[in-house]
Each structure stands twice: as structure tokens, then as C-alpha cells.
């Protein structure tokens, strides 16, 4: 069985993560599922960014949660230290920009992960409302995703939207909570799985395991019950003969 592939922050092995350019590159390579991260600026603008701070992707000091959108919109996040001159002028995108792109790609589904730093700073209600308002036109193709089960419960109560819970730990308590939450998708770092695990526990969810960059590993995880694997190297996996699209899929 061949799992479906999710582009983790876009085609992040080759392109700047969480940028329009990186997401477009993933889709151009054949990805049908993308994932991106959402933080909130101090003036309430949802932005697409993994870390709350700017050091890693922008190479400069500062916390995005303390800055206004007018300050953030021209910040370059081309990750030149990691990627060189692949896309040096890529700018930190607003969620609105990514939404507008998704609106032009009707076959693409997105996992929109709300980051816990913004939830802690601004509160579940404010962050969720800002995200849902922006994503409303494409919400039928977006899965609200988070480590926070609280924001996912609120999302489900406010909208008829699919949710994905990201496990901090793979243990009995987390699985009991997952059964109660009943998300459509359950994310987990595959390295957190017990080595003795033969089959992932079934539930109302589909399993999404990350961070996977090896085709044989993707197949092995699929045998354990993973319907999806998430990868920053999505383009490489899509072109790997082991994961040929002509093979049997979920």
C-alpha cells in the first residue's frame, strides 16, 4: 500500500518553508496535500510562519507575535543560510495570500496548523476567529490542525470543519483523548512510535506520520496503518519509483 503524501511546510527540502513559492513548488511536483503553519501578529493578522521568532528563517532578531503586519510583510524568509540563492526574495506571507492561492488550486487540500505560541499569547478565541475568517472561502478544503485540542474543539463547534490533532506523545492517555476528540486526522512523529508496534490503533481518524524523507520508510509506515506521511522532501518522494502513483493507494 502506498500512502498519500503531505508537503510539510511546502517542498521545504528545496524551497523556503512556509512560503508561497515553496507551496507552489510542492504542487508543481505533484503534491495534492500541503501543510503550513499559522501564527498571529500583534495587530491580529494571521501569518504563515512556524517559529514565533524570526531568527531561523529570516536570519534576524525579533518575535513575530510582537510585531505589526506592516513590519512583517516585507521581511524576507528565503533561508539563504540553508538554501543559498534558491529563492532569496521570498517574503513572509499572510494567510490571506495563501488562501488566495488555494482558491486557484481546487484540487489541493491543506492542513492549516495553528501554532500554540500564538494561542498562548492571544487566546484561543481571538486566534481561531482570525484564522477562520480568512480561510472561510476555502474552508471546505482546509483541515484545522494543532497540538491544542482546545482550539480544535472550538473550531468544530464554530464551523463544520475537519480537524487534525498533532500528538505530543504517543501513549495510552493521548489515545484515550484522541478517541474522545475523534479528529478526522491524527498526526504523530513516527519516531515517537514504540519499536514493537505492529499496527497503529484504528479510530475515526486517518493517521498522518512525519517527518518522512525515505520512500521505503513511507511504505513500512503504510503497512502499519498510516494513510498519509508528511515530508519536507515531498518532491523527492513523489519522483521515487517505490512510491509510483500507479501502485495501490489508500
Language model regions located:
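Phosphate-group recognition and catalysis centered on beta-loop-alpha active-site segments
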Residues: 1-250
Amino acid at each position: 500500500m502506498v500512502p498519500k503524501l503531505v508537503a510539510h511546510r511546502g517542498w521545504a527540502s528545496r524551497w523556503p518553508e512556509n512560503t508561497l513559492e515553496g507551496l507552489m513548488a510542492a504542487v508543481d511536483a505533484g503534491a495534492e496535500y500541503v501543510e503550513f503553519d499559522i501564527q498571529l501578529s500583534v495587530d491580529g493578522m494571521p501569518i504563515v510562519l512556524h517559529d514565533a521568532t524570526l531568527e531561523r528563517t529570516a536570519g534576524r532578531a525579533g518575535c513575530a507575535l510582537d510585531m505589526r503586519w506592516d513590519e512583517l510583510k516585507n521581511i524576507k524568509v528565503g533561508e539563504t543560510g540553508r538554501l543559498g540563492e534558491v529563492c532569496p526574495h521570498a517574503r513572509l506571507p499572510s494567510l490571506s495570500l495563501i488562501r488566495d492561492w488555494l482558491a486557484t488550486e481546487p484540487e489541493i487540500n491543506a492542513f492549516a496548523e495553528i501554532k500554540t505560541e500564538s494561542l498562548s499569547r492571544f487566546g484561543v478565541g481571538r486566534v481561531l476567529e482570525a484564522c477562520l475568517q480568512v480561510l472561510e472561502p476555502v474552508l471546505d478544503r482546509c483541515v484545522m490542525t494543532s497540538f491544542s485540542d482546545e482550539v480544535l474543539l472550538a473550531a468544530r463547534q464554530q464551523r463544520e470543519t475537519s480537524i487534525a490533532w498533532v500528538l505530543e506523545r504517543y501513549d495510552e492517555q493521548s489515545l484515550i483523548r484522541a478517541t474522545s476528540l475523534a479528529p478526522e486526522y491524527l498526526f504523530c512523529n513516527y519516531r515517537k512510535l514504540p519499536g514493537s508496534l505492529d499496527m497503529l490503533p484504528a479510530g475515526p481518524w486517518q493517521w498522518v506520520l512525519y517527518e518522512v524523507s525515505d520512500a521505503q520508510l513511507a511504505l513500512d509506515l503504510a503497512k502499519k496503518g498510516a494513510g498519509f506521511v508528511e515530508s519536507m522532501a515531498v518532491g523527492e518522494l513523489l519522483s521515487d519509483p517505490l512510491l509510483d502513483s500507479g501502485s495501490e493507494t489508500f
